[in-house]
A protein has these predicted regions:
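Active-site-proximal, Lys/Arg-enriched surface segment
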Residues: 46-47, 80-165
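Gly/serine-rich nucleotide phosphate-binding loop at the start of the catalytic core
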Residues: 2-82, 86
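Electropositive, glycine- and tryptophan-enriched low-complexity nucleic-acid-binding patches
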Residues: 68, 74-77, 139-196, 296-308
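Short amphipathic alpha-helical "interface-anchor" segments enriched in bulky aromatics
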Residues: 322-350
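An internal, acidic/charged active-site-proximal segment
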Residues: 173-296, 382-391, 429-431, 435-438
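Short, conserved catalytic/metal-binding motifs centered on acidic residues
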Residues: 57-61, 111-126, 156, 196-205, ...
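Basic, amphipathic alpha-helical segments enriched in Lys/Arg and hydrophobic/aromatic residues
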Residues: 345-402
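Long, low-complexity C-terminal extensions of enzymes
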Residues: 379-438
Length: 438
């Protein structure tokens, strides 16, 4: 049987240059003694070698620091003690993506709101010593089907379009003893922005306190619990009328099988062969927060077992745009999967608070950058048999691993480790106070 006469797949070196330029841009602003070794940490994450060595940073970095004395130790020390600001790295990576990649921010509504997405993840640490490990908390493990000790991280991403592909660029990471604590830390330290934003979150994050903290500039939209009770807003009183304050309206359960009252909007959409019913209630509020008005959208899709209930404080956004805003939340979840599968986020092998925070945060940063670069480049085939290649972070990591020598040389260009000069002519002095003899 003869082989088909087909032309060979073209190979491109553009991803190698883009990834190397990204690393070089990130570490160039760091101190001289730290930049070189933090660049090596990012190289091991970009090429997937950290996963190959089961999270051992010393073994993954050894081929790049073999020529240095105690090279692997200096890599570990730079990660744990180096002067590195994670927030500054995130902002520099975001600026690099806007400058070097065809990035188009996602905007919704007449107010042109950008869409940041926020979610949390549980990094299980079953074998870690509780007394030795830092930033430990309790989180639910789906594999063990119980609550276990873990590092709980919350990540904030900005959803953008790169060549038509939705990508989440990591902007902040925070840790806590619980997911609620980590999420609260992210909301307390949001990146500054002159634009109006609509934060897309999930059910565990869309709490009453977060809806109360939302503002007109930074609105909140997220999935609500199925059994959440809400109230209709009271009818406005005529101006100048005195008397007792107006009583709130009747109770509404938007997630119930038969919600009370009539919705303000009730439409039916045709998606493929399914008929999806979409209902909207305006000017609802929680019993504990009568001054915080929200709009609630319920989506009944035959393909899902439970209805999707979405609440938002951005009441000027249309019903279709609310559904789209919640759909933009999914790019943050692949960031966790990419960081776990190819950046060894689930195997941090770190114990101090600084090392744990930097290992997990840099893994999320490397994963989001790889996804962004892969979306901007042509699909990378794994071999001559791969005729349906796609642009993914895993394929890009495999391509960078094949070009590891050139990739490392480009990423560490104009960077060199600090050399420590050994003092050969040390002068002994007798002025140093000696300890008292026993």
């Amino acid at each position: 049987m003869s082989k088909p006469n087909t032309p060979p797949l073209p190979l491109t070196a553009k991803p190698v240059y883009l990834a190397a330029h990204a690393i070089n841009t990130l570490v160039r602003t760091l101190p001289v003694g730290t930049a070189y070794f933090i660049g090596i940490v990012l190289i091991t994450m970009f090429t997937g070698q950290l996963v190959h060595h089961q999270g051992s940073l010393a073994r993954a970095a050894l081929p790049y620091v073999r020529h240095l004395r105690w090279g692997w130790h200096r890599v570990e020390r730079a990660l744990e003690r180096g002067k590195v600001s994670l927030d500054a790295l995130f902002e520099r990576a975001f600026t690099w993506c806007l400058t070097c990649l065809p990035v188009e921010p996602v905007r919704l509504g007449s107010e042109r709101r950008t869409v940041p997405a926020l979610d949390s993840s549980t990094v299980v640490r079953l074998r870690a010593n509780k007394k030795r490990s830092a930033l430990m908390g309790k989180g639910y493990c789906h594999r063990a089907q119980r609550a276990v000790q873990a590092n709980l991280v919350a990540a904030l991403t900005t959803v953008v379009l790169i060549c038509g592909v939705r990508v989440g660029l990591v902007r902040r990471t925070r840790f806590g003893a619980t997911c609620q604590e980590a999420v609260a830390k992210v909301f307390a330290d949001l990146p500054q922005s002159s634009e109006q934003r609509l934060f897309s979150v999930d059910a565990g994050i869309a709490t009453i306190e977060q809806f109360q903290a939302a503002t007109a500039r930074d609105a909140l939209g997220g999935r609500l619990r199925k059994n959440v009770p809400l109230r209709r807003a009271p009818h406005p009183k005529p101006p100048g009328q005195r008397g007792r304050p107006a009583q709130p309206g009747p109770v509404v359960h938007p997630g119930a099988q038969r919600p009370e009252g009539r919705p303000d909007e009730d439409t039916t959409l045709r998606i493929g062969e399914r008929e999806v019913r979409v209902r909207r209630w305006r000017n609802l509020h929680f019993r504990e927060a009568p001054r915080t008005l929200i709009d609630v959208v319920r989506v009944d899709d035959p393909a899902s077992k439970r209805p999707l209930v979405i609440g938002t404080t951005a009441r000027a956004v249309t019903t279709a745009e609310i559904r789209v805003a919640y759909g933009h939340r999914w790019p943050i979840e692949p960031n966790f999967f990419v960081a776990q599968g190819t950046r060894a986020m689930e195997m941090p092998r770190a114990w101090s608070a600084t090392a744990v925070e930097r290992r997990i945060s840099l893994a999320l940063l490397a994963g989001s950058l790889l996804k962004a670069i892969a979306a901007a480049c042509a699909p990378l085939p794994m071999g001559p048999w791969d005729w349906k290649a796609v642009s993914s972070a895993g394929r890009l990591a495999n391509h960078l691993a094949l070009q590891a020598g050139n990739f490392a040389a480009l990423a560490l260009q104009d960077l060199a480790p600090r050399t420590y000069r050994k003092i050969t002519n040390a002068k002994e002095t007798t002025e140093v106070q000696l300890p008292l003899a026993a």
